[in-house]
Design a protein with these regions (language model features):
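Bacterial N-terminal signal peptides that target proteins for export
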Residues: 1-12
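Processing junctions and N-termini across compartments
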Residues: 44, 51, 160, 181-182
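Signal peptide processing junction and immediate N-terminal pro/mature segment
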Residues: 19-31
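Extended, charged low-complexity segments
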Residues: 176, 181-238
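Short, surface-exposed beta-strand/loop "edge" segments at domain boundaries and coil↔beta transitions
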Residues: 77-85, 100-102, 123-132, 165, ...
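N-terminal Sec/ER secretory leader and immediately downstream segment
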Residues: 34-105, 109-117
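Sequence contexts marking disulfide-bonded cysteines in secreted/extracellular proteins
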Residues: 49-51, 56-58, 165-167, 186-189
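Extracellular-facing segments of soluble proteins and assemblies that are Gly/Ser/Thr-biased and enriched
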Residues: 98-163
Length: 238
């Protein structure tokens, strides 16, 4: 009887300890000062120096030769990051890698080292600029690599997600104009989304790049990728 009572008491003690520990863990996971967790959403635009909508034969011919550069842009409609309101602001990440980015085929590619430039909206305050750079580093962590430059400049982004007609102008450094893919853009009958977007997004769809490229400093090269099936339009919510 004494053994059973002791055993039950031990179980109750362990249960109480678990509840206390659980409560502590829950408290530790709560935002500081009972602030609500960050939520942020908006529109996303991406372009690469290779076709993302293509057939396997074309993709395998390009891998290792193209697709080492990319432009990723977020148009933040509403939300906060690390407690800083970023509603209405834009931020752009420009990437140069050592090999094809995001290749999902059987050929082994090693994109590292990666260098990048972050372009932040000139309308942002100092605190917002820091938060925009942090936002990019968190949500594009796999491809941000070594950030060699952060610059503030006027960034304009326009989205028509129905007709897939979008425009990005980041000063005189980054530019992208897209339209919907149509039948004449197909080169074979095996086209598919061969390369997924480089970051987590929602409702992504490939688009035709009318004009696009990077003409800024920091990456040791500039590039353009007009008239290619190389862009993505999407939304995001984190």
């Amino acid at each position: 009887m004494f053994y059973r009572i002791s055993l039950y008491a031990g179980i109750l003690s362990l249960g109480a300890a678990a509840l206390i520990s659980s409560g502590r863990l829950a408290a530790d996971n709560e935002p500081a000062n009972n602030q609500p967790a960050d939520e942020i959403s908006g529109n996303y635009l991406e372009t690469r120096t290779c076709d993302v909508y293509t057939g396997p034969c074309f993709a395998n011919a390009q891998v290792g030769l193209t697709g080492r550069q990319a432009i990723m842009a977020w148009n933040i409609e509403t939300g906060t990051h690390e407690g800083t309101d970023l509603s209405g602001l834009n931020v752009v990440l420009v990437i140069r890698a050592a090999d094809t980015l995001g290749f999902g085929g059987t050929v082994v590619v090693r994109p590292d080292p990666i260098k990048s430039v972050i372009l932040v909206d000139e309308r942002a305050t100092d605190a917002q600029r820091a938060a925009l750079a942090s936002f990019v580093k968190r949500h594009a962590a796999r491809v941000t690599g070594d950030v060699v430059r952060v610059a503030s400049l006027p960034i304009e982004m326009r989205f028509d997600l129905i007709d897939m007609e979008c425009r990005l102008e980041a000063g005189k450094e980054a530019r992208l104009v897209t339209r919907r893919l149509v039948a004449r853009d197909r080169c074979c009958t095996n086209e598919e989304i061969f390369y997924p977007p480089l970051t987590e997004v929602e409702h992504s769809a490939p688009a035709f790049t009318i004009d696009g490229g990077f003409a800024g400093r920091g990456l040791g090269q500039t590039w353009s990728n007009p008239k290619t099936r190389s862009s993505f339009l999407a939304t995001f919510a984190y």
